[in-house]
Amino acid sequence: MTETTTGPVSRADLLALTPDTLTALANRGLVKRATKELDAGTAPSLTTEPDTTVRARFDDGITAVLPPGVGLDNGSCSCAAPGVCRHLVALVLAYQRDAGAGTDGAPVPVPVTDWSPGSTDDRALADALGARTLAVARRTFERGYGALVHRPTAERPEPWVELPTCTVRFPVPGEIAYALTDAAAAVRDEMVALAVWAFRVADEAGTEDRSTTVQVGGRPTARPTARPELDAAAALADELLREGVAHAGPVLRGALARAGDALAAGSLHWPAGAVAELTGQLAAYADRAAHYRPELVAALLTEVHARRRAAAVPGALGTREAGDTPLRRVRLTALGCRVRGTAEALVAEVYFAHPGAGSVLVLRGEWTADGQELNGHRLATRRVLSTSLSALATGSLVSESVRRTASRALTITRGRLGTTSITPVGAAWTQLPEPLLVRDLSALTARWRGRPPRLIRPRVEAESVRVVALSEVGSIGYDPAEQCLEAHVRDAAGTSAVLTSAYRPECPGALDALADALGSGATHISGSVHRSGGGIVIDPIAVLTPAGVTVPDLAAGDGSTALAAAGSRSPDPLTAALDEAISALAAAAHSGLSRPTAPTRSRIDKAATALSRTGLARAAALLRAFLNALDGQAESGRTAAWLEAQLHLLVSSELRAAES
């Protein structure tokens, strides 16, 4: 029974705490135990004081107290348990039941409220979080940071913010103290303050969009050329372009590695990532590794210059991103695994959905052959986090020792594996929130319109990886010319897409396993979603069927299963012309602009002719300008002409893929 001086519904914050929110604030075991005790009739006696402080007195004499304006972790209890205890949870549940008494005994429903945490002023923030915490957060504010602000919707009725290295949710309207974040406890309050300030900036912008990207704080941006680390990296990229990957020695590779370290030390995270990947490609070529790709090297060289040119554009350099952040106890849902490499060395990337953050994270592992050639299936039994790679790629991971980088990569703190557990994934895919679970691919890709080119977007791992709910799996066939499996599918909204998976010798059984899973009642598929030629294409990672999750890259088999032939597709002349031109410029970068070969010149000339025939006159002119530079200009003129042509081609190719 509740005794109150202000009425039984005076604490709207307690009524707004759903079982899921209580679980996040405490843990599932405490919520279950408190619920069970209340169901058994051992409810505490509640008293609401004039200032709306709620006291709960239990039969064993224990008293729990929850003042207004504070979260559960700031409540008090006379029991010996540290932190949030079952008595505080029982106080909330009992209060909700009393508030619902007189109808059917259910808690009073709380309507969805369109509110903004940005309405909380700094005085209230200091009261809730502490002046010292606010001072620490203010230093991050002065450096500046980016955030993605989400306002309440019918599907997700709580405001939330995606910060560079964590997510903050506000489940209780008007109450900052109940904010939830996946950041570790040591930085929790600081992240809450940053999220509130992000909402404040979004509110001042006055946009009606339910999701909007904002840049918060920061001093005026310096001139783009006032960054010596970036200038040094661009100069080394030019040197590599002149010399060519085929002639790059260990001295240049070492200089690039040091340049990448300097960029990272200067918090230029996105160009640092590009230089690190470029250094990895040079090492792959030196080792004659199969994952060396000339087109990727050319794109990375271009990216370094593109980010330098766009240095004044918010988000182009990643200077406002934190290096990494420890996360509190998190539950992640595995979405499968991608294996790349050779028989001598393989890299496995396990993808995890983070439901609380609405993002996909990547955990990467590397293995080298130990007397036996490696492939995806043999990798499946290798140990990762005290379990097999196969179990990890099809499981749910609960951990208190995870760190998340700005690029959404995961690391597990060494020596704390005991705080990490893995259980089968079950039906967790079907319970993922949007935007992780996609039911309408058209709506997903529509949100991509107007975003910056990939060359200057944030370097986020698994940017386009999603789980797609399927309503239909149509024809499945193998294209021997392209060495890829194709399947026509429809999502839950009826939008069609083409599922395409290329054969890779390191995973010989992947296509057979994929075809079998698609033909066995597939209901969901995880994969990288992108647009190509106006259509939607999915590169699959794993498939959910009534029998469970199939990860093709880890499947057994030698690829000898006979697959039905895929239907023929009409080639797209625009895409083909752009692809060939990009490949021709990549070949020039591979051999070096200081020593262009006759075959390279001929290939570029033919590519320019093809571009002209398809109406891409500007692209053709830039290619011919590069050819002219090879004949008469100094090496600096050659690199400038190559860069102008390459930039135009890469952006044109991206725009062509997005056309509807």
Segments (PLM) and residue ranges:
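Long, low-complexity, compositionally biased intrinsically disordered regions
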Residues: M1-S660
